[in-house]
Amino acid sequence: MTQTLSQLENSGAFIERHIGPDAAQQQEMLNAVGAQSLNALTGQIVPKDIQLATPPQVGAPATEYAALAELKAIASRNKRFTSYIGMGYTAVQLPPVILRNMLENPGWYTAYTPYQPEVSQGRLEALLNFQQVTLDLTGLDMASASLLDEATAAAEAMAMAKRVSKLKNANRFFVASDVHPQTLDVVRTRAETFGFEVIVDDAQKVLDHQDVFGVLLQQVGTTGEIHDYTALISELKSRKIVVSVAADIMALVLLTAPGKQGADIVFGSAQRFGVPMGYGGPHAAFFAAKDEYKRSMPGRIIGVSKDAAGNTALRMAMQTREQHIRREKANSNICTSQVLLANIASLYAVYHGPVGLKRIANRIHRLTDILAAGLQQKGLKLRHAHYFDTLCVEVADKAGVLTRAEAAEINLRSDILNAVGITLDETTTRENVMQLFNVLLGDNHGLDIDTLDKDVAHDSRSIQPAMLRDDEILTHPVFNRYHSETEMMRYMHSLERKDLALNQAMIPLGSCTMKLNAAAEMIPITWPEFAELHPFCPPEQAEGYQQMIAQLADWLVKLTGYDAVCMQPNSGAQGEYAGLLAIRHYHESRNEGHRDICLIPASAHGTNPASAHMAGMQVVVVACDKNGNIDLTDLRAKAEQAGDNLSCIMVTYPSTHGVYEETIREVCEVVHQFGGQVYLDGANMNAQVGITSPGFIGADVSHLNLHKTFCIPHGGGGPGMGPIGVKAHLAPFVPGHSVVQIEGMLTRQGAVSAAPFGSASILPISWMYIRMMGAEGLKKASQVAILNANYIASRLQDAFPVLYTGRDGRVAHECILDIRPLKEETGISELDIAKRLIDYGFHAPTMSFPVAGTLMVEPTESESKVELDRFIDAMLAIRAEIDQVKAGVWPLEDNPLVNAPHIQSELVAEWAHPYSREVAVFPAGVADKYWPTVKRLDDVYGDRNLFCSCVPISEYQ
């Protein structure tokens, strides 16, 4: 039969690229699970009353090339003015070697958070380098492996200050009046839910205020002034007040480390170490503190430990501080951080080294001195005598200056009374400085750059002598070796080889949705039209961003069944926090601010109780029945007991137990009956899209993990995006922003992220995914994700029983394998199986969540039947190995499972094991071998001997 032109054009071609199993493989799997079709399987699994009758109207699919062309046309509407706005965001030069070999490399961007350190040593080393950069520049003892942005780091610093404060009755937090406005905005939002009073005043007046537990200072103020706070910090410390300092990472190359001046906590943005502005993000924040406060720090911390053979190995340290273990008692709700961006900043420091960084910082400062000298020579007044890269210039004809700047396609900071702000950066040239002279002075100023340079080179007083750094930085060999592109390329490749990412094998982590991050989706993030915009540029310069964000929001509204979407939260945990704040403020608007009880099922992800605690709520746990479902009797009892104090329930759907609960609508109705709101966690949205939706189910608010369902890569632990969808009654209560008015949002609420649209520059990834898949492809993706999970469950059921199933013995898009009976019989644990999978070339499934002693498997729709069968065969082979232990062929203390993973060096070492080398490293005929570089980590040693900076030089010799 002759095909039509429409068929030949094949606008849905990308659907077949994204979905792993082809039609024949899908039919084989359907036969294996006993279903006639994808629709029939979906109909059996998803409760009838929540199935959508018609698919969401998000349009037809587009080819990769058509979608790229369409998005390019949208991006071209953005105007790329030269930005001197500053305020914590500057233009950068990302070294091409890092752009090509990391940012554009799936070996880096498709990896997961390094919970399995044996397959993560490369990015762990890069993160350890990031921590070393932080330690050297801040002068403190302990650093984290990144936070979400500078403003949220400030909020975390405030919370940490209260945790460690000895002034237990003090409840006021002082913020210096010249911190960045977006930082103050986020601090105020967090303080409100914690019940702290925020005082904003001149830093020198801090001692006039009583009952202050913590202080936030900014070393280089928002309008550019360098502050020497040494004496003030000393006085504050004598009064037992915890001092936090916000610092500029490039300025720290030249300026005294705040830690040396007595600061307890130092944080800031690492954006200017090679990460484009991207209309606000994603960017990594750095965070450091004194050693005595290490167990109160937020976020991931990378530590040096030992493996089973005594070799140096890296791991995430002190995880007992974090939400996945401590839940509502965690230091923070942080789950995703900004690993990919931290690693870009880390490698930027490695590539330039201390000499290169000083050259960059000195060049920026020299050009700033030249600009200052020329302006002063012509009679303009600078508001501050001491500065690094930012001038606050008083101008009589401000309107005229701004008009000339606009004509020259220049953005100055314009929100300062009777003055303009000018921040220079590493992209600034002498030609740029001449252009600034023209804008500020007119064309006939007669100034000469070389003449001014000679003047300021010998007589620069813009940095106080006491504020000049007098210690060496980045002395470790890693920062002093890889300065040629050849060396740098090989170093990055050596790190990449140590890790297991999606470019090598499926990553079957339950609750994580490690699906394809298609190349076509990734391409737009490096387009300068998206990468080079300042988040606070005039809105008419960001029309492309606004159009793209509006389209994406409209699609998400239709896919979720909500009425509005807020794009600001820059992680899933931030989305939870923002959604809960919307609920809190909604209740307050109805004079029901007393509603503060949040019901959370026992199976919930750890971020849920941690976020509820951050939002000022009390957590009450609801039991689950023997089938893993929410116990309706217990729910009713807890809701009735809470009564007028019930704020909400946080529920995940499908549940974290991997099933579609039949009573989800009844759960919503019970909570609504008692005046509560329903927060439906979007972690498992990949099993809803096109089939059902949170709004249709009856929820009021959800966050969406764009880094799960909508294809933003995990980046080894970030970036993520967690926009929230809300019903109309909650829309007035989503986050706002103090600097930028968010179009279409009537909210007057505070911000939860530094930038108005969070990590805006990665939103094109999700735009591309939805545009290329269309309604048809999105539904099919959900259906194939369900098929793949049921195929794995059915084939592994006899070897590893599936703990929870729904109607007809089916699972949703993931399944929980119960290892507990095997452990009782044989002594082999879920940990042993997870580590043995490494020898077979696989990342482990999620261990012991949501049930201890289990493995949760989520294959996603992107994995083909060939890869699923390879994983299944590996699991069945491992089961056969367990049977060998059970039969006594191998002793429990010496077998391929408890000794896993095996590394190359073992092949040439003495071999005294009762199994062969071949069984150890080439089990079941593994062909494409992945070699871990370390054996099993010693977690206890790592936490008892905490060491979180680069390993000693001897390790490099």
Swiss-Prot record:
Keywords: Oxidoreductase, Pyridoxal phosphate. GO terms for biological process: glycine decarboxylation via glycine cleavage system; one-carbon metabolic process. Signal peptide: none annotated. GO terms for cellular component: cytosol; glycine cleavage complex. It is an enzyme of class 1 (oxidoreductase). The glycine cleavage system catalyzes the degradation of glycine. The P protein binds the alpha-amino group of glycine through its pyridoxal phosphate cofactor; CO(2) is released and the remaining methylamine moiety is then transferred to the lipoamide cofactor of the H protein. The modification N6-(pyridoxal phosphate)lysine is found at K708. It comes from Escherichia coli (strain K12). SUPFAM superfamilies: PLP-dependent transferases. Its EC number is 1.4.4.2. Belongs to the GcvP family. It comes from the Bacteria. This is Glycine dehydrogenase (decarboxylating).
